[in-house]
Design a protein with these regions (language model features):
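Structural signal for short hydrophobic segments within the conserved structured cores
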Residues: 1, 29-31
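Polyanion-binding surface elements
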Residues: 1-22, 51
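Short amphipathic alpha-helical segments
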Residues: 4-5, 38-40
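Glycine-centered, phosphate/nucleic-acid-interacting loop/turn motifs that mediate DNA/RNA or nucleotide
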Residues: 26
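Short Lys/Arg-enriched helix C-cap and helix-to-coil transition segments
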Residues: 31-38
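A short, Lys/Arg-enriched interface patch at domain edges and termini
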Residues: 43-63
């Protein structure tokens, strides 16, 4: 499934426009449509997300 750059920004909690900029710099895998617009494959975006196990997340919040 293809997703918009704005959806990637929201999913990764990035400022709007960051995914599009990274794609244009060839630093993020993307698909360039015939009209020049950029889309991302949702499975590739999900692969960028690192899941932190809950027991580690609890340790990170301790002073």
């Amino acid at each position: 499934m293809l997703v918009y750059p704005e959806d990637v920004d929201r999913r990764l909690t990035w400022p709007l426009g960051k995914a599009k900029r990274l794609a244009r710099q060839h630093k993020l895998p993307h698909i360039l449509l015939p009209d020049g617009s950029i889309r991302f494959e949702s499975s590739e975006v999900e692969a960028l997300i690192v899941r932190v196990p809950q027991h580690f997340a609890g340790e990170l919040s301790r002073p």
